[in-house]
């Protein structure tokens, strides 16, 4: 039971952080002057780019352990879906979103071109897809734990 709570809180916080980037942070940053927007976007990309890989990995491990803990429960199939979706999301992130994030993190604020701004807008749209997939994994885990 305590492990369930730890898993739910950790995964829920990660999804909340990812959602806040898409729903609040990036829309606010887009209203700044171009140099300020570029500087802030670069800082967010650098900081979150350092933290998120570990948080994603830890949450994947939490889901796998949840599957082991609940392996004899009726909801184990639901729990099994969660890490599968999580791994798909990690692969999508590594192959598509991370390279764009690295370019944004490394940019010079004075060189924030329209091309880079369009690339950031594309990243934002793909990030929303990631948040949706993470949310589906989370709901699957919650259903599995509850069943």
Model segments located where?
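Core segments of transmembrane alpha-helices
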Residues: 55-66, 130-139
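Internal alpha-helical transmembrane segments of multi-pass membrane proteins, especially GPCRs
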Residues: 46, 53, 80-83, 121-124, ...
């Amino acid at each position: 039971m305590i492990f369930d709570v730890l898993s739910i809180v950790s995964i829920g916080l990660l999804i909340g952080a990812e959602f806040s980037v898409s729903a609040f942070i990036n829309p606010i940053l887009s209203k700044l002057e171009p140099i300020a927007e570029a500087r802030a976007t670069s800082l967010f990309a650098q900081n979150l780019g350092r933290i998120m890989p570990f948080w994603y990995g830890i949450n994947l491990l939490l889901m796998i352990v949840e599957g082991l803990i609940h392996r004899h429960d009726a909801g184990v199939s639901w729990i099994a879906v969660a890490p599968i979706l999580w791994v798909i999301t990690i692969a999508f992130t590594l192959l598509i979103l991370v390279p764009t994030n690295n370019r944004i993190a490394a940019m010079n604020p004075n060189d924030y071109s329209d091309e880079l701004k369009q690339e950031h807008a594309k990243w934002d749209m793909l990030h929303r897809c990631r948040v949706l997939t993470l949310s589906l994994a989370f709901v699957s885990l919650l259903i599995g734990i509850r069943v």
